[in-house]
Design a protein with these regions (language model features):
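Ligand-site clamp/hinge motif
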Residues: 34, 124, 158-218, 259, ...
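Gly/Pro-rich hinge or "lid" segments in bacterial periplasmic/extracellular proteins
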Residues: 5-7, 102-180, 190-191
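Extracellular/periplasmic solute-recognition and catalytic clefts
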Residues: 57, 75, 139-151, 182-249, ...
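Surface-exposed binding/hinge segments that line
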Residues: 32, 66-117, 135-142
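Alpha-helical secondary-structure segments
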Residues: 46-53, 81-87, 134-135, 175-180, ...
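Aromatic- and charge-enriched surface segment that lines or borders ligand/interaction sites
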Residues: 18-63, 79, 85, 192-197, ...
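A structural "hinge/loop" feature
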Residues: 14-17, 43, 94-107, 241-245, ...
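N-terminal lobe/hinge region of extracytoplasmic solute-binding protein
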Residues: 1-24, 55, 131
Length: 274
């Protein structure tokens, strides 16, 4: 529903058309859905898809986010074709942060109701040719999991990227995204470096300082985010902390036990190392 601009650090509405409107005590949130987005099979994306997705998660405890969703959301209802109302179990002011993207992703990826509602069990459904709202569809993939090829939709202007447009995404009006994007598993460190140096790949992730320096000594076209140390932004926005599974019984469901763990930690030392 909400994406993240990682440069500004601000959320923006993607499938949603706004940042949601709460009632006075934040126990209800009304969300407008952006009109004009089409699934890759041509169907309109609307409130039915959003309501179905959240209720699917709530009703299937095999889905990882089910317990957390039921902890805060009481019900999700369709108001009209492009409006959804969320009723919370308690005051919940951080609604968009919890149910949108704030770091790397979200547990609440809207799925096509007209596809998933036809499945006997959504938790075992192998969606190998997914119908998507984004600009790329799966063109082909390796059954061993070594690579996957994505192709730009012919109607990408009706995808989330095209409909949201340059208001939030950084591209010019006359710019067309790459026709294909190929994600590959490149093997060990030596293989990864060789393929980067020989220009067989465009982007390489999770590179050590030593690997970067070795590759740059063989190919002067290889660059990082910055030309000088630290070469990339070192601030990791991921949360760091202990999470207790309270559903597993003693001793984790005992508040005194959890407080004892917290009080035993050297917070100053943790801050230095984390």
């Amino acid at each position: 529903l909400w994406e993240m601009d990682t440069v500004s650090g601000e959320q923006f509405p993607e499938i949603a058309a706004d940042m949601g409107t709460p009632n006075e005590d934040f126990t209800e949130w009304t969300v407008k859905i952006r009109e004009g987005i089409k699934w890759s099979d041509g169907e309109d994306l609307n409130a039915d898809d959003v309501v179905f997705t959240f209720n699917m998660i709530k009703e299937n405890d095999k889905i990882g986010a089910s317990a957390a969703t039921n902890l805060y959301i009481d019900k999700v209802e369709k108001v009209d074709d492009y409006t959804v109302k969320f009723t919370m179990k308690e005051s919940f002011p951080r609604f968009t942060q919890r149910y949108g993207i704030t770091v790397w992703g979200t547990d609440y990826r809207i799925v096509p109701e007209h596809i998933y509602s036809q499945q006997a069990d959504v938790t075992t459904f192998k969606d190998e040719q997914p119908v998507v709202a984004g600009p790329y569809t799966v063109e082909d993939y390796d059954s061993n999991g070594d690579w996957i090829l994505y192709k730009l939709r012919d109607d990408w202007k009706e995808s989330t990227l095209g409909v949201v447009g340059t208001e939030h995404y950084n591209y010019s009006e006359d710019q067309v995204p790459a026709e294909y994007v190929w994600f590959r598993y490149l093997g060990d460190s030596s293989s990864r470096q060789m393929q980067m140096v020989s220009n067989e790949v465009d982007i390489l992730c999770e590179v050590t300082m030593e690997e970067l320096q070795a590759m740059q000594s063989s190919n002067d076209k290889i660059n990082a985010w910055y030309n000088e140390f630290p070469y990339a932004t070192m601030d990791d926005p991921g949360a760091k902390g202990l999470v207790f599974s309270q559903g597993q019984g003693a001793p984790y469901d005992n508040p005194d036990f959890r407080w004892a763990i917290v009080l035993a930690l050297d917070i100053d030392l943790s801050l230095i190392h984390i």
